[in-house]
């Protein structure tokens, strides 16, 4: 057995172990049809990304699952990769070029792409290297990139297939337009920021009448594109105006007054201006009423030639001028100060403009149906289940997906326009000529695809699709997807309908959803708040294992969690506790044969039974994806039952070389520690590997050792009950000593009084534990109080009373006060149980065993209360 260092130094251990794992290729997986497959595809981080706490949680959860399944004998594959992040990367490259005094247009498309690829090569792998610091055990031989050759082939294949089936089309719709970046952006890239603004209340005169319609808008500049005014059809105030026309001020243009149920009668005046080219809801109203669409802005956010004297002005400058004119001409009623959520581009922070644009779209109605069915048929499951409702809500209300982006970095749309006949040819490769008229005068679409288009293919493109690879046959559908609730729509849904459409199967069996990590005040981490925490700094100061343990034990599936430094300190302390306990075991260890069970003591059987139960409970929790609960159970077992109780219990046997049960104690210490380390390994891979390799030096690594499973031969329930009773007694003695301020050095005579023969037997044969753990000078077990002075303090445990004659050490007034508190506590418990059993609803619905448990509690608490009352009466005499 190798000697273990005195202290655990993560900075030394982690790099050495990770290098060993990489050299030995423990993470690498080949198709093995003799084993059950288990596959996870990593949520690919952006190549522009730096590791943040969200990445750390997301990938820790995946690593836990993959390490567990690997140890459990599965053919476990974790596919890593990175996303090309079209707009983020393009912005980074543009910024770098700007520092050199260059623009995209200066170098042209090819020159820009050369620079983008060079940037990717230099910076794209940083975050993957950072994930190694976290201990991630991905198959690094299989790293994928959403623009690598295989993924690009999958993208082209998918686009062409969908186009041929009529699911991809080109049309005019409202999209999110960023005037700063001059591209369409997805809803996922729009962040809503609370800003001070105004409601401008404006009168629109009715043609042929003195009446006016009063309405309010936050964007007066868009009124130049108004093509109607709408009211609710059931609004009696305006029914007489439906079908008439009104005048749009400033333009003095006549537009119809239409009736549409979109209008909220209760909001404002119940009248809204309709600008189909600049509002998604107005666009839908425009479709229903066949209204013209007038776009009033250029791509850079300036007003276009359709806006008369405002042409060329920035939209915000035009707003001021329009409001000024409205005021001068008497149409402006009032300006109301408000705070409202403004959609901004999350990358450049510019306010986005809803604008009508000719773009490429995916028709979603038919594609959504299989994605709905696979969930309804329970072939696809969400953990927690409530997120399935969100999934269904999105699918039932899905709109066509805008997939074109006005960017150069990304998958270029494989559509070729004929300058002679106008036909569009869609092909995986440049066709060279128009498929309709044969003209060679064709040009490829300048736009690229939304980043999510390639991400939607990730579960199968990473396994080799569109080719029928062995990996695709063996590992698809993948086992579980781990992701945050924030991208259920933007990523999860798109992967599901893509998998169903292209492969005919769901992309994964389960979706494990986690929440966000917030600071200790519940706020999101952000640069503006200055509350960000760098995981790499945490790893440098604490090690990866404490960070992983803190993240996972603080996490309940689907819920946000808060980051507390105190919890991180506790996790580091746990590492030290586990290290010191292991070192203690190794210092006392001797090689020997496995002892026969007859040589095992009650304490040995108790801890074996406990670790056996632990293996079963951890397996159950992991199978339900309750990773935090599983980790907490192992943590509690190691800290409390193994370190604080069992090790202390066996010390007298270890220190006595003549003790006939010493070998059994050593064997048990080692066996339980090995099993505990294995159970903790998925959560804390580095320290468990280091300790395991010192204890079990005949094995190469804990990673491929056998996962602990429940063994019937380690089931000692009677011994569990026995030692648990002793623990309860010792704990109560310690509590009394602490309450009475009895110094640890003072030895106390402990009396155990019980009429129960079985209880007396347990305590009679456990005296050494009281001497070791409760600082007892002597332990006397008897049937009654004979010989025990009336001034002794006591504690009631089940079927026994523990007495300690502390007359010279104890303030009896305090003892009476303590017993009064205990009495109140027990009275509350009795009252609670009695009321519960008197509740007819509970009795009618609860299972029989639950009712029996409550009745047993009632009996137990009443007996304990009677003993406390008796003791109080004696002390008050």
State where each predicted segment sits.
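Feature 926 captures the class I aminoacyl-tRNA synthetase adenylation module centered on the KMSKS loop
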Residues: 201, 393-453, 457, 501-544, ...
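Short Cys/His-rich metal-coordination motifs, predominantly Zn2+-binding knuckles/fingers
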Residues: 181, 251, 348, 419-421, ...
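Structured ligand/cofactor/substrate-binding pocket environments in proteins
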Residues: 54-66, 73, 82-83, 151-154, ...
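N-terminal, positively charged nucleic-acid-binding surface of large information/translation enzymes
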Residues: 1-234, 258, 275-288, 292-307, ...
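Active-site-adjacent bridging/hinge elements
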Residues: 34-42, 64, 100-102, 128-135, ...
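Secondary-structure transition/capping motifs at alpha-helix termini
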Residues: 67-75, 96-109, 129, 133-138, ...
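Short acidic-hydrophobic surface loop/beta-edge motif
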Residues: 200-207, 244-249, 343-347, 416, ...
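Short, polar/flexible loop-turn hinges at active-site or ligand-entry regions and domain interfaces
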Residues: 99-114, 381-382, 536, 557-569, ...
């Amino acid at each position: 057995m190798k000697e273990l260092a005195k202290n655990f130094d993560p900075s030394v251990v982690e790099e050495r172990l990770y290098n060993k794992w990489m050299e030995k290729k423990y993470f690498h997986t080949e198709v093995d049809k003799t084993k059950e497959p288990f596959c996870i595809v990593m949520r690919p981080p952006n190549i522009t990304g730096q590791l943040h706490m969200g990445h750390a949680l997301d990938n820790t959860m995946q690593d836990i699952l993959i390490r567990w399944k690997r140890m459990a004998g599965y053919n476990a594959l974790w596919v890593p990769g990175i996303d090309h992040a079209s707009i983020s990367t393009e912005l980074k490259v543009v910024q770098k070029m700007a520092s050199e005094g260059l623009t995209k247009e200066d170098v042209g498309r090819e020159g820009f792409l050369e620079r983008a690829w060079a940037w990717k090569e230099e910076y794209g792998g940083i975050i993957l290297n950072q994930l190694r610091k976290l201990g991630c055990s991905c198959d690094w031989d299989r790293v994928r990139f959403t623009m690598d050759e295989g993924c690009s082939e999958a993208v082209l294949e998918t686009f062409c297939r969908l186009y041929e089936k009529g699911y991809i089309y080109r049309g005019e719709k409202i999209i999110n337009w960023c005037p700063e970046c001059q591209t369409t952006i997805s809803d996922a890239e729009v962040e809503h920021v609370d800003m001070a603004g105004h409601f401008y209340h404006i009168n629109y005169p009715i043609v042929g009448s003195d009446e006016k319609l009063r309405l309010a808008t936050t964007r007066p500049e868009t009124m130049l594109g108004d093509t109607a005014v709408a009211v609710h059809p059931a609004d009696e105030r305006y029914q007489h105006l439906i079908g008439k026309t009104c005048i749009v001020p400033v333009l003095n243009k006549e537009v119809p007054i239409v009736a549409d149920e979109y209008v909220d009668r209760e909001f404002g005046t119940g009248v809204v201006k309709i600008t189909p080219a600049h509002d998604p809801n107005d666009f839908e109203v425009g479709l229903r009423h066949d209204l013209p669409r007038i776009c009033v802005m250029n791509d850079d956010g300036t007003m276009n030639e359709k806006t008369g004297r405002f042409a060329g002005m920035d939209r915000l400058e035009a707003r001021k001028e329009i409001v000024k004119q409205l005021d001068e001409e008497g149409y402006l009623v009032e300006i109301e100060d408000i705070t409202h959520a403004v959609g901004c581009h999350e990358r450049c922070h510019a306010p986005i403009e809803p604008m009508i644009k000719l773009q490429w779209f995916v028709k979603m109605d038919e594609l959504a149906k299989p994605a709905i069915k696979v969930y309804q048929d329970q072939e696809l499951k969400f953990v927690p289940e409530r997120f399935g409702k969100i999934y269904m809500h999105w699918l039932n209300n899905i709109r066509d997906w805008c997939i074109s982006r006005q960017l150069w970095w990304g998958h270029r749309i494989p559509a070729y326009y004929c300058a002679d006949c106008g036909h569009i040819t869609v092909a995986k490769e440049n066709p060279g000529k128009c498929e309709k008229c044969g003209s060679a005068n064709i040009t490829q679409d300048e736009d690229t695809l939304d980043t999510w288009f390639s991400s939607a293919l990730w579960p199968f493109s990473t396994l080799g699709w569109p080719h029928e690879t062995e990996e695709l046959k063996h590992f698809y559908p993948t086992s579980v997807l781990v992701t945050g609730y924030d991208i259920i729509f933007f990523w999860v849904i798109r992967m599901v309908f893509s998998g169903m459409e292209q492969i005919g199967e769901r992309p994964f069996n389960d979706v494990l959803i986690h929440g966000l990590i917030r600071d200790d005040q519940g706020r999101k981490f952000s640069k503006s708040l200055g509350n960000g925490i760098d995981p790499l700094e945490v790893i440098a100061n604490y090690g990866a294992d404490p960070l992983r343990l803190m993240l996972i034990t603080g996490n309940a599936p689907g819920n946000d969690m808060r980051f507390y430094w105190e919890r991180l300190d506790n996790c580091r302390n746990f590492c030290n506790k586990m290290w010191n306990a292991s070192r203690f075991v190794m210092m006392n260890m001797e090689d020997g044969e496995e002892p026969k069970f007859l040589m095992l003591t009650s304490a040995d059987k108790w801890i074996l039974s406990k670790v056996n139960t632990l293996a079963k409970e951890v397996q159950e929790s992991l199978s339900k994806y309750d990773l935090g609960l599983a980790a907490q159970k192992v943590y509690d077992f190691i800290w409390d039952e193994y370190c604080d109780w069992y090790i202390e219990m066996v010390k007298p046997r270890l220190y006595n070389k003549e003790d006939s049960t010493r070998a059994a104690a050593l064997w048990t210490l080692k066996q339980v520690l090995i099993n505990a380390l294995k159970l903790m390994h998925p959560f804390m891979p580095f320290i468990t590997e280091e300790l395991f390799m010192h204890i079990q030096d005949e094995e190469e690594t804990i990673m491929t050792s056998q996962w602990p499973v429940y063994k019937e031969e380690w089931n000692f329930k009677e011994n569990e009950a026995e030692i648990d009773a002793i623990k309860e007694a010792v704990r109560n003695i310690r509590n009394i000593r602490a309450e009475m301020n009895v110094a640890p050095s003072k030895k106390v005579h402990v009396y155990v009084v019980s009429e129960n023969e079985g209880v007396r037997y347990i305590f009679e044969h456990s005296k050494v534990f009281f001497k070791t753990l409760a600082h007892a000078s002597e332990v006397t077990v008897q049937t009654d109080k004979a010989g025990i002075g009336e001034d002794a303090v006591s504690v009631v445990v089940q079927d026994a009373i523990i007495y300690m004659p502390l007359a010279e050490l104890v303030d009896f007034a305090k003892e009476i006060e303590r017993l009064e508190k205990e009495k109140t506590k027990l009275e509350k418990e009795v009252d609670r149980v009695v009321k519960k059993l008197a509740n007819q609803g509970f009795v009618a619905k609860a299972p029989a065993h639950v009712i029996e448990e409550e009745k047993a509690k009632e009996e137990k608490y009443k007996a304990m209360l009677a003993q406390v009352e008796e003791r109080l009466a004696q002390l008050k005499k």
